[in-house]
A protein has these predicted regions:
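Conserved GNAT-fold acetyl-CoA-binding loop/helix
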Residues: 29-50, 60-62
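Short loop/turn motifs at secondary-structure junctions and domain boundaries
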Residues: 53-57
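Acyl-donor (CoA/ACP) binding surface of acyl/acetyltransferases
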Residues: 1-32, 65-183
Length: 183
């Protein structure tokens, strides 16, 4: 699956992306709202899971590359959330970019393209996103792309211990009817 926006190319991850994406995932600043930075091996395993989801469902998180210089700046996309959190099963949208790509509108631009693909091409009925309550930047992206906070669905991330600062999660959602009415 390849999508293009004014400034971005959204494409499946390739073998040559592992080193760069591993570097992004190992950055403590990037992973501030995740339990821990990831090793190269963990990143490789994650990419394999995403490739499997792409095969099974026809969509998965994908590479984000800038059009002007073809640099990999992170990931964004849709993924089938199968289990592990109370809102599963559902389709989720997410993003993770290197710090040099922050505050440029790239996450919003990529997410809007993925919403259009999810609703217009895949025919999804609803798309969810979740993030730690502390991650205000991701919540702002969710709001910019038209998602609404579904407070009744907020949850405590089960894989983190009680009292962990990243355990409280906020859930945003966008039903297809709302998306269609806005476009």
């Amino acid at each position: 699956m390849y999508l293009q926006t004014d400034r971005l190319i959204l494409r499946p991850f390739e073998a040559g992306d592992l080193t760069r994406f591993s570097h992004i995932n190992a950055d403590p600043e990037v992973m501030r709202f995740f339990p821990a930075p990831q090793t190269s091996e963990e990143t490789a395993q994650m990419l394999a899971r995403w490739a499997d989801k792409q095969t099974r469902y026809g969509y998965a998180f994908a590479a984000v590359e800038t059009r002007h210089d073809k640099q990999l700046i992170g990931m964004a996309g849709l993924s089938r959330l199968e289990d592990g959190v109370p809102i599963a099963p559902c389709s989720e949208i997410g993003w993770r970019l290197t710090p040099s790509a922050w505050h440029k509108g790239y996450a919003t631009e990529a997410a809007r393209a993925w919403l259009a693909y999810g609703f217009d091409t895949l025919g999804l009925s609803e798309i969810f996103s979740y993030t730690p309550r502390l991650n205000l930047a991701s919540q702002r992206v969710m709001q910019r792309i038209g998602m609404q906070h579904a407070q009744a669905l907020d949850f405590e991330y089960p894989a983190l211990p009680e009292g962990h600062e990243l355990r409280p999660m906020v859930v945003y959602r966008l039903p297809s009817q709302t998306y269609v009415a806005r476009t």
